[in-house]
Amino acid sequence: MTDFSDFRNNGYILKRNLFSKDEVSKLIRYIEDNSEKEDQARETFSSTGKLNITLWNHPSDDLFGKFSTNERIVKPMEEFLGDEVYHYHSKVIWKKPGDGGFDWHQDYGYWYHNACLYPDMGSCFIMLDKATKENGCLKVLKGSQKVGRIGHGVSDTPEQTADLDRIHELEKRHECVHIEANAGDALFFHANLLHSSDSNKSNESRRTLIVCFNTKSNNPYKEKGHASYSPLKISSYNSIMEY
């Protein structure tokens, strides 16, 4: 199978060694040394505990921007989604020892409410540390993007969680895949793919940069506080190490 057919059939594709050890180390140092996004940091809570998340809508001309607009991410995403894409938002998740995970959800379960009519959206999940079952790596239900959008926050389900009755049934029909990966690997996945993660039971932090994209043709039909279409200035392959 090609990457395109894997993405269409399974809802995701894992690209090994998309970024080098030197590139990842440079970003980790930048995260640790740079406080310019501290005012955007927040804690979020799930059924398994808390997580630290920093989120921003517009890529700036800094090291974060060199990653989030890099041709290694943007060009495959345009191939997978079949359209020009633009930066929807990016976030750094810092899962410290003992921190919780995320309940089962679809990104489009949230983004639907941001006036995006279609699920023609996707994310690139870049590992900055080794991801294992022990430290709460991402889990996906393979092929679950084909189900379509599922209600979130229905009945007694938390607002950020997909309908648990449907999840229980889908778990019987779709393989649950733990995305164990190394630093520098990157997971591309569709906005309707069901995914979750467990708590970090290790003694080490797990850091991730997630870059989310919308397609040009799916520009929100009204203002909802998230990024509308703006042409993306794609960064070159070498722009990270040249920064």
Language model features: what each stretch is:
Residues 83-90, 100-102, 120-126, 136, ...:
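Generic beta-strand structural signal
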Residues 145-243:
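Conserved double-stranded beta-helix
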Residues 106, 128-130, 190-191:
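Residues immediately flanking
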Residues 2-10, 15-115, 153, 224, ...:
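Non-heme Fe(II)-dependent double-stranded beta-helix
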Residues 73, 97-99, 130-133, 146, ...:
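Short, charged/polar surface micro-motifs in flexible loops or helix N-caps
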Residues 114-133, 180-181, 212-215:
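Short, conserved beta-strand element in jelly-roll/cupin
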Residues 14, 124, 187-189:
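Short hydrophobic-aromatic micro-motifs
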